[in-house]
């Protein structure tokens, strides 16, 4: 970003938008909805490309992610917020989504396991920050060479500090996630923690191998047993954390 000062009375959100309009050119739009837009930008002084998110969201999630570097998460460069809206400038990951690959052909177990382990590394970092991704699915994984990158933090939230609250308070009040991949507790049945991401990852791993949800067609052998444990309805019966899942894989 250019080293220019804020205009007196200008919010950082307005300043950030002004800097973006001067330094970047919009190449294309990945997504546009009534209240959000995801654009691909090119820096005017180079060929480097970035993703710009313009949407409602939780700035604290992105601030936490700015503090880490992980090969399997996009780097968050800058953000600004105003009245519940966010502008987020993040790393552009070239490549196809995992959904694109699975739509073309199923993956060998070895390749599927490698991708799952890389997403486990991304989740290890997020869970270490106290974050739950809450929308792990093939369309939110970009494959760039041998690198798998978990994207889209619009559904991400912080884990609650006190998971065992009195009845009526120990559950999520906002339903987020994608049908088929979201853990049962994400539908307001219980409080969400990192085990919800393990459920989604288990479903995704099964889809990579069989093309279907594990409830309809479960992968065979040892990997099928790992997937079965990941996707238990009761979170207490799943792997307790992502490290244990990585060991199982």
Residue ranges and their predicted role:
Residues 23-64:
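ATP-binding glycine-rich loop module of kinase domains
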Residues 69-78:
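Conserved HxN/HPN-centered segment at the entrance to the catalytic loop
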Residues 83-97:
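Conserved short submotifs of the Hanks-type protein kinase catalytic core
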Residues 97-107:
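AlphaC helix of the protein kinase catalytic domain
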Residues 115-116:
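Activation segment signature within eukaryotic-like protein kinase domains
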Residues 127-143:
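Catalytic-loop of the protein kinase fold
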Residues 169-185:
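Conserved activation segment of eukaryotic-like protein kinases, specifically the C-terminal portion
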Residues 185-195:
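Conserved end of the kinase activation segment
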